[in-house]
Amino acid sequence: KIQEGKGYLVPELRGIFDSWYDQKLKTEIYPQYQDVLTIKAEEIKAIPKGTAYERLQKMVGISQIKAVIEKALNYNKLQKIYREKGIKTGRPVMHMVFTGNPGTAKTTVARLLAQIMQDNGLLSRGHLVEVGRSDLVGKYVGWTAKCVKEKFKEAKGGVLFIDEAYSLLDNRAGSYGDEAINTIVQEMENHREELVVIFAGYPEKMEEFIQKNPGLRSRIAFHVSFPDYNELELCQIAQLMGKEKGIEFTQ
C-alpha cells in the first residue's frame, strides 16, 4: 500500500505494483489463482545445482548477477508450482544487458550463467555463442537478417552473447546495422523461451544503444553492472588463483 506523502524509489514502486497485481490476479481476475495464496516464500526458494553455480559463488564481487540468478531460479521453481496446481504460465523474458569495462568478468559470468541455467532446467543445452558486429552484419543486401537468424539458431538452448552491441549502430536509417538490430528484436521475441540474449559493453555506450531502440529496451529483463575491482578484491582474486594452483601468498 502506498502511503501518502512518502517518497519511493522506482524499485519499491515496482515491488508494490507487482504485489498488488499478483493479488488482483489471484482474487479477482483468475479465481483459480486462489490456491497459490497458500504458497509460502520458503517453498519457492530454489536449491541451485551444479559446479558452475559453485564456481560463481566463489567469484569475488559480482553481487548483482548473483542476485539475478537467484531470482531466476526461484521464479523457475514458482513456475513449476503453478503448473502442478494446473495454472498455465509462460517463461518470463530472461534477456540481459551486462555493462562494465574490459576485465570485469562479463564473458566469464555469461559462460557460467549458461551452464547454471542448463544445470537447473532453464535452458536445454547451456552453451555460449559469442558474437560481434562482423558475425551479424552481412556484406550485401539481404545477408544480414540471414546472419542473425543463423546465430540465433546456433545459440538455441543456450546464451547468445553480443559483445559491444553498440557497434551495430550506423547512425543512418536503413543501414545494415539497423537491419541487424530489427532482426535481433524479432528473434528475441520468437525464441524467448529457447535462449537468453546478453548484450555487453561499456556502460555509457550501452545506455545510448538501449535508449535508441524502444523495441529492444522493452525486451530486456535485467540490467547488470560489473564495476571495476578495487584493490582488496584484486588481492582476493590473486589469492583464489594462487590457491587453485597450489600457491600460497604471504603478507
Language model features with spans:
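Pre-Walker A (pre-P-loop) alpha-helix and adjacent loop at the N terminus of AAA/AAA+ ATPase modules
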Residues: 51-94
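Walker A/P-loop
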Residues: 87-126, 150-154, 220
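Canonical AAA+ ATPase core
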Residues: 166-172, 181-227, 232-235, 243-245
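Short glycine-rich substrate-engagement loop in P-loop NTPases that contacts/grips substrate
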Residues: 125-155, 178
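Conserved P-loop NTPase "ATPase switch" module shared by AAA+ and STAND
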Residues: 132, 155-174
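Conserved C-terminal helix/linker of AAA+ ATPases
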Residues: 6, 10-46, 83-84, 203, ...
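Conserved C-terminal "switch" segment of AAA+ ATPases
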Residues: 1-10, 27-29, 120-125, 208-211, ...
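Hydrophobic positions in the central parallel beta-sheet of the AAA+
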Residues: 96, 129-131, 160-161, 197
